[in-house]
Amino acid sequence: MERRRDRGGEGQKEQVVRREGLMSNERLTRPQLILSLYLCFGASLSTKLMDRLAKHRANFSPHDKYLLLNHLDKLASKSKLIVDSIFRPLYRFKAAMILRSQRLISVTAALDPSAYCETPVYNPDLCPNMIAAQAKLVYHLNKYYNEKCQSRKAAISKTIREVCKVVSDVLKEVEVQEPRFISSLSEMDNRFEGLEVISPTEFEVVLYLNQMGVFNFVDDGSLPGCAVLKLSDGRKRSMSLWVEFITASGYLSARKIRSRFQTLVAQAVDKCSYRDVVKMVADTSEVKLRIRDRYVVQITPAFKCTGIWPRSAAHWPLPHIPWPGPNRVAEVKAEGFNLLSKECYSLNGKQSSAESDAWVLQFAEAENRLLLGGCRKKCLSVLKALRDRHLELPGQPLNNYHMKTLVSYECEKHPRESDWDENCLGDRLNGILLQLISCLQCRRCPHYFLPNLDLFQGKPHSALENAAKQTWRLAREILTNPKSLEKL
């Protein structure tokens, strides 16, 4: 949802973005008490509470409070250990929580939004086992990272080298046929520029094109997540390196370039030295290669845009959120963005002529820059490993990019660097998993820089519902039994 208002007489508009499906940065930004209750009593909570949970309303009626207290009392009766595990990641409330005979007598004050404190404070007086439980979770997460995540990284690195050998050979053949498509796939600091890991068996290689200079970048917001390239002057048409791909209206067509590139790659596959192990993926307008019947690589022509920032992302960073700092913002915007020749669809699922000519915005380098420092990348690595092992579901509702997006939102909700110390890894992971459940229930996951773009668009509702249930089971297991990470 967005609200716009005119500022003065200049016609400038201020965009205020409200990210539905994500917790807004209001006074009570994280009602983790209710979310944690949901992890243990998801099916038994009332429909009304479920609705409130999905909408993240900060204020609750007396009846809601009664239901919550009743469930808390039942929970305390069942197990003091579970109570400790639930209250461990919560933030300080000005509350009197008394554990007597393994029963929770009163937590009414814990539901008071005015008592919320943004900074996590671990007070042994509130819950004696809280610090020990947190340390235990961090210990098992670090063990999981060192054993599972590092082995995953090593395996993927080996796969990337194998895949890039094949792709490089194919692109060399393309370049021989058409010198305008020059291979930009190169290794730098043990990573390949322009390569993105979608999953351990799926990759995307961005092929950067030259000479975008005679085109203007037009980003009017009519196509969420997309923009067009229009000739700056009709008289410059013949000066463009890509003259045959310019439409009658003066737009550089992403579809036409992709179609030409697909033809070239198909010819190159038949001529390259790896022709016995690589073949084109049929029934798609995208350029995809299947290598050794195990890996799929999408090769996408693109323009790299530096020194400018899209108008559809002009609201970022949000003025009331202190993260990231001015220096980091400058670095991120200096990284710029890419314009990818990929398919983009409107809400009705059909591609219009305007969309076929449009280019998809991508912020890969800017997003990587945001996640520098603290345990951010470690947290993302754990999430990716958990996704690969437990959330690779029918309909493919979740991918690594969803996890990356939620880590960025978590950084906004916890802007201080101290919030990302190694000893906070458990809290951050727990918060992101809870947020993922919320997004799946709401069937909406806004793009971090382009909140009008829903990353769940086109995903089957049944697949999202199934993913929400599986994520709930996973989060509950980690929350109540950190040692279970040894088997996850």
Question: What is each model feature region?
Answer:
Residues A154-T201, L209-W359, R369, C375-R389, ...:
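Conserved catalytic core of two-metal-ion nucleotidyltransferases
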Residues R27, Q298, I308, S484-L488:
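Membrane-interface soluble catalytic domains
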